[in-house]
Amino acid sequence: MSMDHLPIAIVGAGPVGLAAAAHLLERGLAPMVFEAGATAGASIGRWGHVRMFSPWSFNIDAKAAALLAPTGWVAPPADAYPTGRDLLTQYLWPLAEVAPIRQRLHLNSRVVSVSRAGHDVMRTAQRGQAPFVLRVAGPEGERDVLARAVIDASGTYATPNWMGTHGIPALGEMASADRIAYSVPDVLGEARHRYANRRVLVLGSGHSAFNALHDLAELAAAEPRTQVLWAIRGVSLERILGGGKNDQLQERGKLGLVIRRLLDEGKIALHTGVHVDRIADSPEGLRLH
C-alpha cells in the first residue's frame, strides 16, 4: 500500500519541530505538526526568563529563516544571546504564523500514543510497511491520524527526572509535589514570593540547576534570610562546572565560573554523594533521606 499521500507527523512545535516542518516543505513534502500547548514552543515559555548559552546564529534554522524572509522578518543579531522569551517572540512565534506552517499546526493537540495501523503485539507481519497511527487528544476529543512517518520533537522538559535514586519517584515525592519545582522557576520575578527568605535545595548537576543556583544566590543577596543548598549525586565538581574560559560555549563557561565563585564565597552550600530514597515532611520543611 502506498503511503505517499499521507502527511509526515511532527510531534512538538518547538524550534526543532518547526525547523523540521520547514525542511519538509522545502522538499515538497506535507508536514502535520501537533503541539500539546496553546502556543508554539509552549515548554520554552516555562523558562522564558533564562538566557541561553548559544547565540542566535546557533538557534535560527536556514530553511525556517527562508520561510520568514518574505514576511519582512528581521533576524536578530547573530552574536547576541537570547532568553527563552526572546526565542519565542523574535523567532518561533513569527515562524508559527507563516502561512505554510500555520495551516499545518495543530495547537492544544497532545499525541498520547503512536502505533502501526492494523498491527498489535500479536500481529506483526509486514508491520514496517503499515502507516503510523497517532492517537491525538485535542479540543474536540480524541482522534486517530495516519502518517507515513513520525518525527518526535516533543523534547524532555515536560518529563523531568525524578528525585528518587532508582529512576522512579522517591517515597513521598508525589505527596510533596506542590512544594517541588521540576523546572527553572523565575525566582527573581513571578516566583520571588515563594522562595524569598526560605531554605531552598537545588538537586541536580545540569545547567538548569546552575541557572537556578545563580538566580537564588542573587535573590539571597537581596533577601538575606534566603539559604541556598545544592545536592548532587556525584562526589566531585570537576566534570560538572564546564570548561571555564576554554568552554566552547562562552556563556556556559561563564556560568560555571560564577557558580564556582559562589561556592568559594560560601553563598551556596554544597552536598555531594546525595541519593534520595524518601522525602518526609517536618515542621522545618521537607527532609530528604
Where are these regions (language model features)?
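Phosphate-coordination loops involved in phosphoryl transfer and adenosine-cofactor binding
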Residues: 5, 108, 197, 273
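N-terminal Rossmann-like FAD-binding beta1-loop-alpha1 element of flavoenzymes
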Residues: 6-32, 205-219
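Residues at the starts of beta-strands that form the adenosine-phosphate
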Residues: 7, 30, 199, 224-227
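Conserved Rossmann-like nucleotide-cofactor binding loop
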Residues: 16, 39, 157, 208, ...
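Feature captures the FAD/FMN-dependent oxidoreductase FAD-binding
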Residues: 74-159, 277-288
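Glycine-rich dinucleotide-binding loop and its adjacent helix/turn
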Residues: 152-220, 228
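A Rossmann-like FAD-binding core segment of flavoenzymes
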Residues: 218-289
